Amino acid sequence: MNTSLTNAARLFTAGLRALLVLTVVTGIVYPLVVTGVAQGLFPGKANGSEIKADGKVVGSSLIGQSYNLPLKEGRETPEPDLRWFQGRPANGLGTNTVNTRYELILSGATNRSADDPELLQWVQDAKAAVVRDNSVPGHPVRPEDVPADAVTSSGSGLDPDISPRYADLQVHRVAAKNGLPAERVQELVDEHTTPRTLGFIGEPRVNVLELNIALVELVAPGAGH
């Protein structure tokens, strides 16, 4: 009997020691080491890849934003503010219905098949809107000019980047809405186009938030987003 109690006590003590050691190592030491390394080597990425304008954090280079006009009465969705470059559609985004205390965005894809009738209608409507919104006198946009990323959302619905082709398509509209030379706006796009990583990984891309922040510097004071 005493032997059984002794063995049980020994096992309990060993388990308790293991629990305490692992708690300290994995719950305190490891997080502190990882945090220290991240802050020391990659402080920007460790803090969320924040983007600042006028000394204030205005977003993250990893998360897309919408550039819309105030929601009008009677409408379910706001209209895009055509003074600014627009990102990809966000059809997969949902709303937080579990904890309504916080206004959280639930990211995700539509999970619809390529031949889904509603998805096809979304794409057709989005293409028509891109053609309509970006056609300016002397520079009409044709349906075949519209790239895929202009009418389809990403897997997360929060893609911060667009293709250079989609950015180029918006140049004349942005220039006209802001009273700027199209050539200067095109230069802005070119300056904010990131090439393929290492020259062969991924595709060239344009971060919409960074581009619009640069655009603010060109427009009249007080016209910022």
Swiss-Prot record:
Record flagged with keyword Zinc: no
Gene Ontology molecular function: ATP binding; P-type potassium transmembrane transporter activity
Main location: membrane
Signal peptide (residue range): none
InterPro entries: KdpC
Cystine pairs: none
Subcellular location: Cell membrane
Region span, Disordered: 134-161
Keywords: ATP-binding, Cell membrane, Ion transport, Membrane, Nucleotide-binding, Potassium, Potassium transport, Transmembrane, Transmembrane helix, Transport
Protein name: Potassium-transporting ATPase KdpC subunit
